[in-house]
Amino acid sequence: MNPATGNGNSESTAQRPTRNWRIVDFVLRRGFEERDILPVRQVFALLLVFGPIYGAAMGSYNLIVGNRSLTEQVPQMLFSAIKVPMLLTITLLVAIPSFFVVNTLMGLRDDFRSSIRAIVSAQAGLTIILASLLPLTIFSYISFAYLSVSYQMAVLFNAAMFGLASVSAQMLLSRYYRSLIAKNSNHRLMVRLWIFVYAFVGIQTAYVLRPFIGSPNEPTTFFRRESFQNAYIQIWEMFNQVLYSI
């Protein structure tokens, strides 16, 4: 019997969270021991559930700010919902081989399986955090509509949301890595290396997979013809455009 309510098992059952929400809570609050890290299959399930949520929000820009109807904007929202899980998965898969080589050179190969489990669990946290930023993204789009803010600002805003989610996910990663660092201090260097490699690959991958938001002056497409360019040069140019427009 529940000592607080006195209603027995029925009250306990009514208050019991669903299995999926228990997993979400597990990702965000646990992770101090290796046994607390999620299986890879559950991580990818979370990625496929929460990634499209934020992707659809990103793709709603022209529906809220522009003059496009829901019918016209649904394809972009659908494309973005598909591409956010693609972005996170491709970035993970591209970054892992070099991370494996460096771990081997550092004498940490025996712990590599545990390292990957920690990384993919943090990836699940990143996806959940992104989905939690959906209300802020929608609210910002509404504000952009009233303030006549440029499309470039919307792109930079979403980049900032991904940055915020990534920083938060790295906090989770540090927590997941705690037992490994206690075992071998070289893992601390590996965490820092992973953060750098993941961010470097992720920025370029996101640029290749664009558009996620959809320019109001261009037709809706899954990819752009000029996708394979240097992301860092283009981001710098976009940042300068925003500064000069203020």
What is each model feature region?
Residues 2-17, 36-54, 84-89, 118-130:
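Alpha-helical transmembrane segments of integral membrane proteins, especially early/N-terminal helices
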Residues 5-31, 59-65, 169-180, 209:
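Juxtamembrane interface elements at the cytosolic ends of transmembrane helices
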Residues 40-115:
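A glycine-rich, hydrophobic loop/mini-helix early in the fold
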Residues 56-70, 134-139, 209-218:
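Membrane-helix interface motif
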Residues 82-86, 100-214:
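Hydrophobic alpha-helical transmembrane segments and adjacent short intramembrane/lumenal linkers
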Residues 193-194, 198-246:
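Long, intrinsically disordered, low-complexity regulatory segments adjacent to structured domains
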